[in-house]
Structure formats: C-alpha cells, structure tokens
Amino acid sequence: MAGKKVKSNTPKQDLSVSKSKLTSIKAPAAAIKAKAAASAVKKGVSNKSTRKVRTSVIFRRPVTLNNPKKPAYPRRSVNKITKMDQFRILKAPLTTESATQKIEGSNTITFMVDMFANKSQVADAVAKMYDVKVKRVNTLITPRGEKKAFVTLSPEFEAADVANKIGLI
C-alpha cells in the first residue's frame, strides 16, 4: 500500500487567489492603517517619558513606604521603671572640711553619687530633692572607685541654706 495512490472522493479545490482580488483585500487594510497613523501623528505621543540623568556612580536604593506597626497586643505589658531615681543617684552629701569650704566659698555642695549617674542626672536629682536651680556639675572618680559630684548652685540660691536644710552645717 505504500506505493499505491489512494483516490479520495472529495473534488480538488482551487485555493489560488486572483491578482484583482488580492489588491482589493489589501487596500482597505492599508487605508485603515494609514488613517490610524495619521491620527496618531495629529494627536502626538503623550506617553513618551524622558530618562532620568544619573549623576552619581553609586546606586542608592530608593526609600520605600514604611508603614507604622500596629501590633495586635503589647509585647511588654508594663513599661520598665527607671532605676535611676534621685534617691539612687545621690548617695550622701560630703561633710569634710574642704567640702564645707566649698559651700561657703564657691556656692558648691559636694555629693557622693552613683557610679553610673551622669552630670545631667545628678543636676536633675539635686534640683528635685532640694528645690534649687543647678548652675553646673563637676564629677570625678575617687581612688576608691566612687564618684564624687561638685554641684554649683545658681546665684539666686545659697548653698549654705541648702546645706542647713540637709543638716551639713
């Protein structure tokens, strides 16, 4: 059967297209295309965007939207209390002879303070405890490893009055 031709029952169709029909098919499509191109030229191209000029060789990632967190429940039920309150910061006032001279001479009260307290914390603690305005605080660490603070009061407050209130003099 490989060598034999099988005749089919369907008649052959002529699929060739005459030249006159070909031009008539192509002509309307070309006219439509030309019309569309003309209207596009008339309107102008609106989506033409210019490229941003890069002035740096380093690429910095753009800052993206960062929404604030909205937790379903608080992770810490109670806020931490500050351990550095005025009672922990100020350990004791100094009552040595040189400390009393500073009270009389330079309006300064000397305190032994907590090792981890800084100058602003010492100033706030003195202001809160004794209702005075602090001008400046000098600190030093003693050879014994303790911190000493020299608290100079502002001129409208007398260090002698405050020392009297504490019980130094």
Curated annotation (Swiss-Prot):
Keywords: Ribonucleoprotein, Ribosomal protein, RNA-binding, rRNA-binding. GO terms for biological process: translation. It comes from the Eukaryota. Residues 1-20 are annotated as: Disordered. Pfam families: Ribosomal_L23, Ribosomal_L23eN. The keyword Ribonucleoprotein applies. One of its GO terms (molecular function) is structural constituent of ribosome. InterPro entries: Nucleotide-bd_a/b_plait_sf, Ribosomal_uL23, Ribosomal_uL23-like, Ribosomal_uL23/eL15/eS24_sf, Ribosomal_uL23_CS, Ribosomal_uL23_N. PROSITE patterns: RIBOSOMAL_L23 (PS00050). This protein binds to a specific region on the 26S rRNA. This is Large ribosomal subunit protein uL23. The gene is rpl23a.
